[in-house]
Amino acid sequence: MTTFRFCRDCNNMLYPREDKENNRLLFECRTCSYIEEAGSPLVYRHELITNIGETAGVVQDIGSDPTLPRSDRECPKCHSRENVFFQSQQRRKDTSMVLFFVCLACSHIFTSDQKNKRTQFS
């Protein structure tokens, strides 16, 4: 969240300025030349949050993709041991690496932990 700083002498807005001699960030009033040191060298931070699904890009013929690794993990739905797997497409700090398996027999999507089962896609 962006915060504005104001001059303690004239109440006008303070603007960021670089102190090139000491290599530090300052805030300066353009009206009365009041200067104060910034607590942090960060002026602005823009965090991008994407909202793509965990299984984005899964299509019906995913099993014919030769670039995907194969696994013999048992499908919890049909008990087949032929599947492909891929990593979750969510790239956020708060998510851990999740592997998704797609059964080649029934197209069921599941993860390595059996609690997080996925349904069949069309």
Swiss-Prot record:
Zn(2+) 2 binds at residues 75, 78, 103, 106. It is found in: Nucleus, Nucleolus. Pfam families: Zn_ribbon_RPB9 (PF02150), Zn_ribbon_TFIIS (PF01096). One of its GO terms (molecular function) is nucleic acid binding. The keyword Zinc applies. The keyword Acetylation does not apply. A zinc finger (C4-type) spans 7-32. GO terms for cellular component: nucleolus; RNA polymerase II, core complex. Keywords: DNA-directed RNA polymerase, Metal-binding, Nucleus, Transcription, Zinc, Zinc-finger. One of its GO terms (biological process) is transcription-coupled nucleotide-excision repair. Belongs to the archaeal RpoM/eukaryotic RPA12/RPB9/RPC11 RNA polymerase family. DNA-dependent RNA polymerase catalyzes the transcription of DNA into RNA using the four ribonucleoside triphosphates as substrates. Component of RNA polymerase II which synthesizes mRNA precursors and many functional non-coding RNAs. Pol II is the central component of the basal RNA polymerase II transcription machinery. It is composed of mobile elements that move relative to each other. RPB9 is part of the upper jaw surrounding the central large cleft and thought to grab the incoming DNA template. Involved in the regulation of transcription elongation. Component of the RNA polymerase II (Pol II) complex consisting of 12 subunits. This is DNA-directed RNA polymerase II subunit RPB9. The lineage of its organism: Eukaryota, Fungi, Dikarya, Ascomycota, Saccharomycotina. The gene is RPB9.
